[in-house]
Amino acid sequence: MSTYVAACNIEAGKAGIVFQNSEQATMTAKNNTIKVTIGGSSTGIKIIATNSNAGNYMIKGNVIEAANGNGITVNFAKSATIVDNMIKLSGNTTSGISLTGCDSSTVSCNTVSGRYPAVSYQNRGIYGSMNQKCYISCNTTDSLYKGVHFSSSNIATKFRGNEMKKHYIGLYLDNTAVIDTQTHAGNRWTGTYNSTYGAWNENDSSIFNSSKTILIYC
């Protein structure tokens, strides 16, 4: 049986929509307006997949405001599609979109914005950890502590055509991060960065330019 949640107006303390299934059906969240308000573990839309993963999740065209927690979290899913969502991090939040342990999933054409530097919350627009063969493209992040943060292994991840505006750091790779080789990726750094670094790699800071830059390769 498929599940389709669309055009709903949801205000919740902990979670707006949660998909947790046995991978036997398609689950779609589309064109919803969601606000979550309470606690660091709050999530606008949350996907929790199981081991026998058939790739059946679509999160598209949602407008999410997170006063706490995360906008969208996707854990251990295969071929999940997260596209055309608009996420505002209005409070002491963690991430706009968090992708962890996923395989062959797409995060594309999303916009994540916050309130940095007016407030000093150390949040992230997009966070990726322990993924493989994922495609992160054409997203825009603005007014967040970190635009995009990679941690741990993200083998064969493609990071292309993303725009990072005003942040403390636009793109951050911590000392465990691996995202594989990126060639002619077309990412853009179009804002100012209070750290003076548009991008920073804890493993090798020399490969990135500092201050306000527009880069073609990453």
Where are these regions (language model features)?
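Glycine-rich beta-solenoid repeat tracts in large extracellular/virion proteins
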Residues: 1, 15-22, 40-51, 70-76, ...
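Right-handed parallel beta-helix
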Residues: 2-12, 24-38, 54-67, 78-91, ...
